[in-house]
UniProtKB/Swiss-Prot annotation:
It comes from Mycobacterium bovis (strain ATCC BAA-935 / AF2122/97). Belongs to the TVP38/TMEM64 family. The chain crosses the membrane at residues 32-52, 64-84, 88-108, 149-169, 177-197, 209-229. Keywords: Cell membrane, Membrane, Transmembrane, Transmembrane helix. This is TVP38/TMEM64 family membrane protein Mb1528c. Its main location: membrane. It comes from the Bacteria. Disulfide bonds: none annotated. InterPro entries: TMEM64 (IPR015414), VTT_dom (IPR032816). It is a multi-pass membrane protein. It is found in: Cell membrane. The keyword Protein biosynthesis does not apply.
Length: 252
C-alpha cells in the first residue's frame, strides 16, 4: 500500500471518528442510554451463551433427523445477530454437513444474520444522515447508497474486520439493503468456504488452505477499500463547504 493511500485511509478513518463523536454529542440522552444498555445486553448474551460441543451437535442432529439442517440454519442466524463468534457455527457446518451443504448453510445463515442486525440498527433510528447535519456526511451517505456494495464487499473479504461491526455500521449508513445482502454473501463466500473445509477436515474429508485464502482475500479486500476511498476523496475533497454543517436542525 502506498504512502498516499495510507494517508488517505487514515484521514478517512479520522473523519469517521469525528462524525461518530458528533453523533454522540447531538443524540438525546435516552437514546444514548438505550443504546449502551442494548449493546451491553448483546455482549453479555454473546459471552454467556454456551458453545455446543461436537458431541452435543451430533446428538441434536440425531434427535431432529431431516429437520436438523433447517434448525441449524435458524439457530445460526439468530445467535449471530449479537456479536457472537460465528466461527463455531461455520466449523460445525463443515463437520456436520460436509463441504457443499456446509458452505451453503454457513453463508446463508451469516448473510441473513447480517441483514437482521442491519435492520435492527435502522429500526432504532441510529442513522448518521439524520443525526449529523454535515455536507461531508450527506455526501458520504449518498455515496454509500449508490456504491456501498463495494465497501461492504471489500470489508467482508478482510478476515480481521469484525462481522458484527460491519453489520451495525452499515445499518447507520445509507447502504441499500439488497446491495448489502449481495455484497455480504459474495464477500463471506471465500473465507467461509475455507473455514467450512477446515471443519470438514476434522472429519477426515478435506485439506484446507485457510491461511493462504485469508491472506489473498484480505489483500483483495484492502485493495478494493483503498480504491474506493481514494476515488471518493478525489471526487469530493475539493468541493466547497465539504465539511460545513447544514443549517437544518438534526432530527433526534
Amino acid at each position: 500500500m502506498t504512502a498516499p493511500a495510507i494517508c488517505n485511509t487514515t484521514e478517512t478513518v479520522h473523519g469517521i471518528a469525528t462524525s461518530l463523536g458528533a453523533v454522540a454529542r447531538q443524540a438525546s440522552l435516552p437514546r444514548i442510554v438505550g443504546t449502551v444498555v442494548g449493546i451491553t445486553v448483546l455482549v453479555v448474551v454473546a459471552l454467556l451463551v454456551p458453545v455446543p460441543t461436537a458431541v452435543e451437535l451430533r446428538d441434536w442432529a440425531k434427535s431432529l433427523g431431516a429437520w436438523f439442517p433447517l434448525a441449524f440454519l435458524l439457530v445460526h442466524t439468530v445467535v449471530t445477530v449479537p456479536p457472537f463468534p460465528r466461527t463455531a457455527f461455520t466449523l460445525a457446518a463443515g463437520l456436520l454437513f460436509g463441504s457443499v451443504v456446509g458452505v451453503f448453510i454457513a453463508v446463508v445463515g451469516s448473510t441473513a444474520s447480517a441483514v437482521i442486525a442491519m435492520l435492527l440498527v435502522r429500526a432504532t433510528g441510529w442513522q448518521l444522515n439524520s443525526l449529523v447535519r454535515r455536507r461531508a456526511i450527506n455526501r458520504l451517505d449518498e455515496r454509500l447508497r449508490e456504491r456501498g456494495w463495494l465497501a461492504i464487499l471489500s470489508l467482508r473479504l478482510i478476515p480481521v474486520v469484525p462481522f458484527a461491526a460491519i453489520n451495525y455500521a452499515a445499518g447507520a449508513s445509507g447502504v441499500r439493503i439488497l446491495s448489502f445482502a449481495w455484497a455480504t454473501l459474495a464477500g463471506l463466500l471465500p473465507g467461509t468456504a475455507a473455514v467450512v473445509i477446515l471443519g470438514d477436515a476434522f472429519a477426515g474429508s478435506g485439506s484446507p488452505l485457510l491461511i493462504l485464502v485469508s491472506v489473498c482475500t484480505g489483500a483483495l479486500g484492502l485493495t478494493g477499500l483503498v480504491y474506493e476511498i481514494r476515488n471518493y476523496r478525489r471526487q469530493h475533497r475539493r468541493m466547497p463547504g465539504y465539511d460545513d454543517p447544514v443549517r437544518e436542525p438534526a432530527l433526534i
